[in-house]
């Protein structure tokens, strides 16, 4: 069986974003969204266990045994940096590797809209980047952090599980804390961050009521807070945040969110027309007066209408972004319909 380094290098040469190791089949890699079997022997329990032992410290292995899963990062010189999730299945070890890369892409390279890039200048408020797993949320946030780092005198604290992109101290001071190593959980790390004189706080994921509550408070008290949610679309994102809270608190949270939210950016990665790459589609909602009123009044279902009538402010719905990609020839009709929020309407538009 080849070493994990050989497997990951081969996958990178093939343009893979992810590599999966599990017992009973050869290693698999994901290329442009498609899962492909690699040309290696089937993996035995001893093979995946050996990979685990080689990439983890003793402390990390102990935590893996306790929890049954473990998130970490792993680097190979002259190859790349990987986000790794190790987990148990049928009593054996399985691992998922995601290539992160060593250089933070610029927003322009990612195709991030200019109105989103400009968010790096904000001094306070809540910015949410949302989308399904593997849609590039953490890369978009890393690009915004890098923009801040290159252009602002700021103290940036990132809370990540695990740390993906490594930021050097440039114009800003960037302190990166890994959940499970530098702090026990997001909520505790976020509370501590408020006592560490930050200007900008990145929360890798708003997973629970406690973290969301502290994040909103942090944005209220004069910090720029950046985070992610696994939602698609501004309306579902607002609803998700509100619904985390018990009914008797929801009106208060609507008011707080309407005052603190700066923008919601939702993204999806869509296969290109030639099938060789993927291109990002971005929905962008900036919190202007109309948006804040709708959030306060619990009328999130009307947010799409505000976005459609405020294109000049940099707003765009997901389906409008997909239509734009289609008419630019970047994606085909089938993919446009498949990734649309309203497939029936999309069929009529294209």
Short names for language-model regions:
Residues 1-350:
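Short, flexible helix-loop junctions that flank or precede catalytic/ligand sites
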């Amino acid at each position: 069986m080849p070493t994990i380094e050989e497997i990951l290098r081969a996958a990178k040469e093939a343009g893979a974003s992810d590599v999966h190791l599990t017992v009973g089949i050869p290693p698999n890699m994901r290329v442009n969204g498609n899962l492909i079997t690699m040309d290696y022997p089937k993996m035995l329990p001893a093979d995946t266990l050996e990979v685990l032992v080689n990439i983890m410290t003793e402390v990390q292995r102990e935590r893996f045994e306790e929890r049954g899963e473990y998130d970490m990062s792993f680097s190979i010189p002259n190859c790349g940096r990987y986000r790794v999730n190790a987990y148990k299945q049928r009593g054996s070890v399985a691992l998922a590797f995601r290539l992160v890369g060593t250089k933070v892409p610029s927003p322009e390279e990612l195709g991030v809209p200019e109105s989103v890039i400009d968010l790096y200048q904000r001094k306070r408020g809540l910015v949410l980047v949302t989308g399904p797993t593997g849609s590039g949320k953490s890369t978009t946030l890393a690009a915004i952090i890098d923009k801040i780092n290159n252009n602002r005198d700021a103290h940036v604290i990132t809370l990540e599980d695990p740390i993906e992109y490594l930021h050097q101290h440039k114009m800003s001071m960037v302190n990166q804390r890994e959940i499970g190593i530098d702090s026990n959980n997001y909520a505790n790390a976020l509370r501590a961050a408020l006592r560490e004189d930050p200007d900008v706080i990145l929360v890798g994921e708003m997973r629970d009521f406690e973290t969301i509550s502290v994040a909103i408070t942090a944005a209220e008290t004069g910090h720029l807070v950046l985070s992610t949610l696994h939602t698609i679309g501004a309306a579902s994102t607002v609803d998700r945040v509100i619904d985390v809270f018990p009914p008797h608190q929801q009106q208060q949270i609507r008011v707080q969110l309407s005052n603190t939210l700066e923008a919601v950016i939702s993204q999806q990665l869509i296969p290109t027309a030639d099938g060789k790459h993927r291109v990002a589609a971005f929905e962008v909602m900036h919190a202007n007066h109309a948006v804040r009123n709708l959030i306060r009044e619990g009328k999130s279902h009307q947010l799409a209408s505000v976005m459609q009538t405020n294109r000049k402010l940099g707003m765009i719905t997901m389906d409008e972004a997909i239509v734009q990609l289609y008419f630019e020839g970047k994606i085909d009709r089938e993919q446009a319909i498949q990734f649309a929020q309203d497939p029936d309407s999309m069929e009529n538009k294209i």
